[in-house]
Curated annotation (Swiss-Prot):
Record family assignment: Belongs to the CTP synthase family.
Function, as annotated: Catalyzes the ATP-dependent amination of UTP to CTP with either L-glutamine or ammonia as the source of nitrogen. Regulates intracellular CTP levels through interactions with the four ribonucleotide triphosphates.
Protein known as: CTP synthase
SUPFAM superfamilies: Class I glutamine amidotransferase-like, P-loop containing nucleoside triphosphate hydrolases
Xref: Pfam families: CTP_synth_N, GATase
Reaction(s) catalysed by this chain's protein: UTP + L-glutamine + ATP + H2O = CTP + L-glutamate + ADP + phosphate + 2 H(+); L-glutamine + H2O = L-glutamate + NH4(+); UTP + NH4(+) + ATP = CTP + ADP + phosphate + 2 H(+)
Active-site residues (renumbered): C381, H507, E509
Biased composition (Polar residues): 542-558
């Protein structure tokens, strides 16, 4: 039978509940326990798929095609475990399910209320994750802050959950903030006390307090917090501000979070294997030479809009012993100031996904600059579509070529709507979503990077390369290096003779993991490193490779 952990937050929003949940998952998995993590979001949207990235950050896509909160990306990256649509629950989806049941008559004419019907549906979703995943421990993060009206049904549901499984099979973690007041020179505990008081009023007594702080918390302060909040001193965990989110599991392990959880849940403490994670953090703190990467996007004012892309770049840099020097470049600024002014000195360019025509001309200009200047380039989703448009306009002779999404009346719709999307009216959850196979063409950069004939990648799009232009693109020098198994959909393109120029219709960033970077991102960083001044050892290695390559070439004499 599964054990259950519930993570709540108090005092302020964005306090790091998701990272705490993901870190605990990592620590449990390091001891041999299987873990699944779900997020309960208190907003009324059914899912974040139709929300602006400025409102919500990126939309993370699961294997089964759910559009979810970005925290699910943290869960997957930290635990190296795939989540599903069951792991993302919103107030909107709960109410939708309950109302649908009422319309079908499932409640036999009864009055439908928040308690027990809404809270019962929430509890059912948590049980469903446990049954579907078969995990030893199910961790549930409750979005929002204790005291918010929107979160009350979720908090009531996790209070009721204690009656479902018994007190020995669940634990409550409350993440809170200890603010430092400079004038008094003290960390203040009163906000934490009041936050726990709010929880107790609902009927939840936390087992562990994870206290965010920018400085160490001494034992006297832990004793004070524990006494006022009703938890043992050892269960008051310091969560110091970290230089990287990947350092948080190590910090929480040193503070004893996992041991306390195992004790509360009556689980055996096995030997912990965090060696690879410790090595990863050591690399983060002792990076190699910096690689300058420009991320050219529409939503660069909010970094979370491209969270998985940035993490994938970091993973690749870690493996390649490089540090990431990321430049956030607004695509619209390129339209005004030109790519040569904003991208000069970059070692690589990434154009990620997005929607709408704002900034597209800037992305197209950035791609042309990377192509002509022979700067390594990686395009993702809309980034691939922009690469196709750039080639059509500047190399294939298709003046005015565009996407039918951006310019419905274009004479050359090199990107067009997928046939199965023709009659789709609703926006939410109706795109080509989730994992699909991609067949890799032999003797291509993609085949070299992947080392596989067929790969499986996550998608989120409505528009695709227009096969009416396929032969023209191939004849003009484009290489289609990946397509759907039936050959109908172009999934991956590249340019031969360029140091690194490739773009994909899918989202490889969702599959990148610390210590296991995605092949496309690793290839990009490896190509970018070749632009850096070589150390003496590296210069010898490159010369050796050049000599070997020369020896392998057939002789032109005789």
């Amino acid at each position: 039978m599964a054990k259950f952990v519930f993570v709540t937050g108090g005092v302020v929003s964005s306090i790091g509940k998701g990272i705490v949940a993901a870190s605990l998952g990592r620590l449990l998995k390091s001891r041999g326990y299987s873990v699944s993590i779900l997020k309960l979001d208190p907003y009324l949207n059914v899912d974040p798929g139709t929300m602006s990235p400025f409102q919500h950050g990126e939309v993370f896509v699961t294997e089964d095609g759910a559009e979810t909160d970005l925290d699910l990306g943290h869960y997957e990256r930290f635990t190296d475990t795939a989540m599903s649509r069951l792991n993302s629950v919103t107030t909107g989806s709960i109410y939708q399910a309950v109302i649908n049941k009422e319309r079908r008559g499932d409640y036999n004419g009864g009055t439908v209320q928040v308690i027990p019907h809404i809270t019962g549906e929430i509890r059912e979703r948590i049980h469903r994750v446990a049954a579907n995943s078969g995990a030893d421990v199910v961790i549930t993060e409750i979005g929002g802050t204790v005291g918010d009206i929107e979160s009350l049904p979720f908090l009531e549901a996790i209070r009721e959950f204690r009656g479902d499984v018994g007190r020995n099979d669940l634990a409550y973690i409350h993440v809170t903030l200890l603010p430092f007041i400079g004038t008094s020179g003290e960390l203040k505990t009163k906000p934490t006390q009041h936050s726990v008081k709010e929880l107790r009023a609902i009927g939840i007594q936390p087992d562990v307090l994870v206290c965010r702080s920018d400085r160490p918390i001494n034992e006297d302060l832990k004793s004070k917090i524990g006494g006022f909040c009703g938890v043992p001193n050892r269960a008051v965990i310091t969560a110091l501000d970290a230089d990287s989110i990947y350092a948080v599991p190590i910090s929480l392990e040193e503070e004893g979070l996992c041991l306390e959880m195992l004790d509360v849940l009556n689980l055996t403490d096995h030997d912990s294997d965090m060696k690879s994670w410790v090595e990863l953090v050591h690399k983060l703190r002792n990076p190699g030479p910096a690689v300058k990467v420009a991320l050219v996007g529409k939503y660069v004012q909010l970094n979370d809009a491209y969270l998985s892309v940035v993490e994938a770049l970091r993973h690749a840099c870690l493996t390649q012993d490089a540090s990431l020097e990321l430049s956030w470049v607004c695509a619209e600024q390129i339209e005004t100031h030109g790519p040569e002014n904003l991208l000069k000195g970059m070692d690589a360019v990434v154009v990620p996904g997005g929607f709408g025509n704002r900034g597209v001309d800037g992305k197209v200009a950035a791609i042309r600059w990377a192509r002509e200047q022979r700067v390594p380039f990686l395009g993702l989703c809309l980034g691939m579509q922009c690469a196709v448009i750039e080639w059509a306009r500047n190399q294939a002779g298709l003046t005015g070529a565009s996407s039918s999404e951006l310019e419905p009346d274009t004479n050359h719709p090199v990107i067009h709507l997928l046939p199965e999307q023709q009659d789709v009216v609703d926006l939410g959850g109706t795109m080509r979503l989730g994992v699909y196979p991609c067949r890799i063409a032999p003797d291509t950069l993609a085949q070299k990077l992947y080392g596989e004939q067929v790969v499986y990648e996550r998608h989120r799009h409505r528009y695709e390369f227009n096969n009416s232009y396929r032969n023209l693109f191939i004849e003009s020098g484009y290489t289609i290096s990946g397509s759907s198994p039936d050959g109908r959909l172009v999934e991956l393109i590249e340019l031969k003779g360029h140091p690194f120029f490739t773009a994909c219709q899918y989202h490889p960033e969702f599959l990148s993991r610390p210590g296991k970077p995605h092949p496309l991102f690793r290839g990009l960083i490896e190509a970018a490193q070749l632009r850096l001044p070589a150390s003496p050892d590296e210069a010898l290695r490159r010369q050796s490779q050049t000599n070997i390559s020369a020896q392998e070439q057939p002789s032109r004499i005789g």
